[in-house]
C-alpha cells in the first residue's frame, strides 16, 4: 500500500496544476472578451471615468497643470438704469422668456448661420469655475449626420421607454404626448449638441482642472435658450439617455468631452402644437428672507 503513495501524490499534483491552468485560461478568455468589447466600443471605458472630483488633480499631480497665470484687472464699466427703466426692461425680458415653449414640431426652413454664431457667442459669456469655459458647442447641419444622430437616439429611447425609465416616468410623459420618435432631429435645420469638458489640456500636454464643469455648462445652456428665444427661434431640450458616448464618437469629439444636452433649432412648423401648461406663480418659486 505504501509504494502507491508517491503515485497518488503525483496524481494530486498534476490535478492541482491542471485546475490552475484551466482557471488561468478562463481568466485570459474573459480578459480577451473584455478587450474585444472595449475595442468594439472604444468610448465606454473612457466615458465611465467622467468625474468632476475636485481632488483628482491632487492625486495625480504629475498629470495636472497648476495655474500660474496672472490675470490683469481693469476698471468695470456699468450702465445704471433709472428705476422705471429697470422695471420696464425686466418686465419686457420676462414677457419674452415667458413665451418660450418646448417645440417638437420644427420646420425645415433654413436659419441664418450668423444668428447661430451670435447665440452661441452669447452662451459663451456664461460664468464658469475659475473661468475655464468648459464647453463645446457642436453645430450639425449635414442631413446625413442628423439622420445618424436620430437613429442612435431613437434606438436607445425606445429601450428607455420600454425598460429603463419605469412606469411612473413614462406615465408622466404621456400627458405631454412625447415618445421615442424624434422626427425633429431630421427636420430641424440645425442641431446643437452641447458637450461639457471634464478637464482641459495646456500647451505642455498636462491636464487642466475644470471646476464645476457640469454646473458651468448648464448655465451656458440656459443662456443659449434665452438667446434662441430672443432671436425668434424655437427648440426643445433633449438629454439623450445612454446615447452620449456613441454621439461623441460619431461627431469625433475627444474622450474628455461628455454630451450634456442636444437642441434642435429652427422655426416652428405651421402645424406646431404645444401643451397648455401653466407656470408656477412667483409666491411658489421665491422665498423672501
From Swiss-Prot:
<feature type="binding site">
    <location>
        <position position="130"/>
    </location>
    <ligand>
        <name>3,5-diiodo-L-tyrosine</name>
    </ligand>
</feature>
<keyword id="KW-1133">Transmembrane helix</keyword>
<feature type="binding site">
    <location>
        <position position="182"/>
    </location>
    <ligand>
        <name>3-iodo-L-tyrosine</name>
    </ligand>
</feature>
<feature type="binding site">
    <location>
        <position position="157"/>
    </location>
    <ligand>
        <name>3-iodo-L-tyrosine</name>
    </ligand>
</feature>
<feature type="compositionally biased region" description="Basic and acidic residues">
    <location>
        <begin position="47"/>
        <end position="58"/>
    </location>
</feature>
<feature type="binding site">
    <location>
        <position position="157"/>
    </location>
    <ligand>
        <name>3,5-diiodo-L-tyrosine</name>
    </ligand>
</feature>
<dbReference type="GO" id="GO:0030659">
    <property type="term" value="C:cytoplasmic vesicle membrane"/>
</dbReference>
<keyword id="KW-0968">Cytoplasmic vesicle</keyword>
<keyword id="KW-0560">Oxidoreductase</keyword>
<dbReference type="GO" id="GO:0010181">
    <property type="term" value="F:FMN binding"/>
</dbReference>
<feature type="binding site">
    <location>
        <begin position="128"/>
        <end position="129"/>
    </location>
    <ligand>
        <name>FMN</name>
    </ligand>
</feature>
<dbReference type="GO" id="GO:0005886">
    <property type="term" value="C:plasma membrane"/>
</dbReference>
<dbReference type="GO" id="GO:0006570">
    <property type="term" value="P:tyrosine metabolic process"/>
</dbReference>
<keyword id="KW-0521">NADP</keyword>
<dbReference type="Pfam" id="PF00881">
    <property type="entry name" value="Nitroreductase"/>
</dbReference>
<feature type="binding site">
    <location>
        <position position="279"/>
    </location>
    <ligand>
        <name>FMN</name>
    </ligand>
</feature>
<protein>
    <recommendedName>
        <fullName>Iodotyrosine deiodinase 1</fullName>
        <ecNumber>1.21.1.1</ecNumber>
    </recommendedName>
</protein>
<feature type="binding site">
    <location>
        <position position="128"/>
    </location>
    <ligand>
        <name>FMN</name>
    </ligand>
</feature>
<comment type="similarity">
    <text>Belongs to the nitroreductase family.</text>
</comment>
<feature type="binding site">
    <location>
        <begin position="100"/>
        <end position="104"/>
    </location>
    <ligand>
        <name>FMN</name>
    </ligand>
</feature>
<dbReference type="InterPro" id="IPR000415">
    <property type="entry name" value="Nitroreductase-like"/>
</dbReference>
<feature type="binding site">
    <location>
        <position position="182"/>
    </location>
    <ligand>
        <name>3,5-diiodo-L-tyrosine</name>
    </ligand>
</feature>
<feature type="binding site">
    <location>
        <position position="130"/>
    </location>
    <ligand>
        <name>3-iodo-L-tyrosine</name>
    </ligand>
</feature>
<feature type="compositionally biased region" description="Acidic residues">
    <location>
        <begin position="59"/>
        <end position="69"/>
    </location>
</feature>
<feature type="region of interest" description="Disordered">
    <location>
        <begin position="47"/>
        <end position="69"/>
    </location>
</feature>
<feature type="transmembrane region" description="Helical">
    <location>
        <begin position="1"/>
        <end position="21"/>
    </location>
</feature>
<feature type="binding site">
    <location>
        <position position="161"/>
    </location>
    <ligand>
        <name>3,5-diiodo-L-tyrosine</name>
    </ligand>
</feature>
<keyword id="KW-0285">Flavoprotein</keyword>
<dbReference type="InterPro" id="IPR050627">
    <property type="entry name" value="Nitroreductase/BluB"/>
</dbReference>
<keyword id="KW-0812">Transmembrane</keyword>
<dbReference type="GO" id="GO:0042403">
    <property type="term" value="P:thyroid hormone metabolic process"/>
</dbReference>
<comment type="function">
    <text>Catalyzes the dehalogenation of halotyrosines such as 3-bromo-L-tyrosine, 3-chloro-L-tyrosine, 3-iodo-L-tyrosine and 3,5-diiodo-L-tyrosine. During thyroid hormone biosynthesis, facilitates iodide salvage by catalysing the oxidative NADPH-dependent deiodination of the halogenated by-products of thyroid hormone production, monoiodotyrosine (L-MIT) and diiodotyrosine (L-DIT). The scavanged iodide can then reenter the hormone-producing pathways. Acts more efficiently on 3-iodo-L-tyrosine than 3,5-diiodo-L-tyrosine.</text>
</comment>
<comment type="subunit">
    <text>Homodimer.</text>
</comment>
<keyword id="KW-0472">Membrane</keyword>
<feature type="binding site">
    <location>
        <begin position="237"/>
        <end position="239"/>
    </location>
    <ligand>
        <name>FMN</name>
    </ligand>
</feature>
<keyword id="KW-0288">FMN</keyword>
<keyword id="KW-1003">Cell membrane</keyword>
<feature type="binding site">
    <location>
        <position position="161"/>
    </location>
    <ligand>
        <name>3-iodo-L-tyrosine</name>
    </ligand>
</feature>
<dbReference type="InterPro" id="IPR029479">
    <property type="entry name" value="Nitroreductase"/>
</dbReference>
<dbReference type="GO" id="GO:0140616">
    <property type="term" value="F:iodotyrosine deiodinase activity"/>
</dbReference>
